[in-house]
Amino acid sequence: MRGEIMDYTICREIGKGGFGKVYEVKKKADQKSYALKIETNAPKAGRNSIINEIQAYSELQGCEKIPRLVDHGSYEGLTFLVLPLLKYSLKDLLERHPRFFTKKSATIVGKKLLNAIEFIHGKGRLHRDIKPENVMFGHNNRIYLVDFGMSAPYLRGDGSHIPEVGGKSVSGTLWYMSINTHRGIEQSRRDDLESLFYLLILLYKSRLPWMEPGASVSKKQEARTKEIKENLSVYDLCDGIHGKEHLIKFFQHISSLEFAEKPNYRYLNSLLDKIFHSNKELQGYKRAPKKEDTGLIRTSLWHKFISILSPFEVKYDG
């Protein structure tokens, strides 16, 4: 797409997916850069992910870890939304250097995401697609949780919790979805937190046992991933992580939750604090590299990222 969309001039395409495309745009009035997400085709009858995302962002304004909804509207019958232009995703960082994270920096990311998830849940919503692609870093050195196209309320109009039902189609991203989601059980708060747990394991160990880079998402791949998750013990999954006893308790709390039960976010946060303050590092850089090191991200991006994570002490919000 070239040219203009309403009050915005299109600069370049920066992303795409089943929903449509994302463009870097400039607002005509002030020439500031933003990210504009728009459908590529008018949706057929049923769920419209961008309209759903607009609704979610509208409900979630007020959390510093959720991007501000700048604008939204319709252009030639296609729905669009406008958000601040963020720099890069956690996925970008991991692809450039899989062993980038120390235990402490990974734990800080986990604490910030836990805080964002608690806020989302407090507004009666689920994210339903926690993964590295949806964790972004902004120009103000903040971590943001983005992409609410798959988000859904877990509370009904009368304030009651949605019922637990089976036979649901699988939704989310294969590597990070919960075991219950694999089993076709309706998602609730516990499922977002299980996805966060898997993301933490990825940051601590640089991989997940069921990940097969480049593998196509198929019924066979889905079944194989489900089987590994069901049969692999949390003790084996956390093996090699110093402070693993706290991470094991993190998972055990999540897996013990009933469908409609409220998680104990404060307890989960305290477990991450204990991991953070355990003495040894598992992997990753222990210090910033020397200036003469000219690797792709080992200098400038490292120092940028350290500024994001400083100070290390992340307080519990709420």
From Swiss-Prot:
This is Probable casein kinase I homolog ECU11_1980. It comes from the Eukaryota. The active site is at residue 129. Residues 8-276 form the Protein kinase domain. PANTHER family: CASEIN KINASE-RELATED (PTHR11909). The lineage of its organism: Eukaryota, Fungi, Fungi incertae sedis, Microsporidia, Unikaryonidae. The keyword Nucleotidyltransferase does not apply. GO terms for molecular function: ATP binding; protein serine kinase activity; protein serine/threonine kinase activity. It comes from Encephalitozoon cuniculi (strain GB-M1).
